[in-house]
Amino acid sequence: MEERLILVDTDDRPIGICEKMRAHHEGLLHRAFSIFVFDSAGRLLLQQRALNKYHSGGLWSNTCCGHPRPREALPDAVRRRLGEEMGFACELRPVDALVYRARFENDLIEHEFVHIHVGRFDGTVAPDFAEVAAWRWIDVPTLLEWMADEPSAFTVWFHCMIERAGLPVLHRWAHR
């Protein structure tokens, strides 16, 4: 059975449920989340999306992203997906939300109401390599330089979130 997404209005109020690929073909606004995990040295955990992802394969992005399932509380979904995708758990806290829309080369459209969460973790990362091609810890100045030099190496939503919240702000939230 195909994954189903929670459709929302621009205030994040649920208005329906839809199959994932239909939502992405039609550009329907749906609930999502993005996670930024920092270590105690202040480095951000990045992931490179698996090459076979339905869009943005091979691009670098924040620690983890996902969608809550129908009737799944957002905090539960955030914890679940971090464990599934990156193989660890840590305390995560919500810090911001934004709406973005982007069309991809394969004509899929991401239109998400994204809840941004931050956390701190210093343990072992054990990603699911069906989801993640590679991962690395990176300090904020090096990441910002890399993003300026190679913007096309990163996902659209990662750029949106960095422009909205800024890595230093996310880092401060993670270390409170």
From Swiss-Prot:
GO cellular component, one term: cytoplasm
Positions bound to Mn(2+): H24, H30, H67, E110, E112
Pfam families (alphabetical): NUDIX
Active site: C65, E112
InterPro entries with a match to the protein in the record: Idi_bact (IPR056375), IsopentenylPP_isomerase_typ1 (IPR011876), NUDIX_hydrolase-like_dom_sf (IPR015797), NUDIX_hydrolase_dom (IPR000086)
Gene Ontology biological-process entries: dimethylallyl diphosphate biosynthetic process; isopentenyl diphosphate biosynthetic process
Cofactor requirement: Mg(2+); Mn(2+)
Broad class of enzyme this protein falls into: isomerase
Note accompanying the cofactor annotation: Binds 1 Mg(2+) ion per subunit. The magnesium ion binds only when substrate is bound. Binds 1 Mn(2+) ion per subunit.
One term of GO molecular function: isopentenyl-diphosphate delta-isomerase activity
Binding positions (Mg(2+)): E85
Pathway stated in the Swiss-Prot or TrEMBL entry: Isoprenoid biosynthesis; dimethylallyl diphosphate biosynthesis; dimethylallyl diphosphate from isopentenyl diphosphate: step 1/1
Source taxon at top rank: Bacteria
Compartments (UniProt record): Cytoplasm
The enzyme's E.C. designation: 5.3.3.2
Keyword field: Cytoplasm, Isomerase, Isoprene biosynthesis, Magnesium, Manganese, Metal-binding
Reactions performed catalytically: isopentenyl diphosphate = dimethylallyl diphosphate
Residue ranges of every copy of the Nudix hydrolase domain listed in the record: 28-160
Function: Catalyzes the 1,3-allylic rearrangement of the homoallylic substrate isopentenyl (IPP) to its highly electrophilic allylic isomer, dimethylallyl diphosphate (DMAPP).
Family affiliation: Belongs to the IPP isomerase type 1 family.
NCBIfam families: IPP_isom_1, PRK03759.1
Protein name according to UniProt: Isopentenyl-diphosphate Delta-isomerase
Originating gene: idi
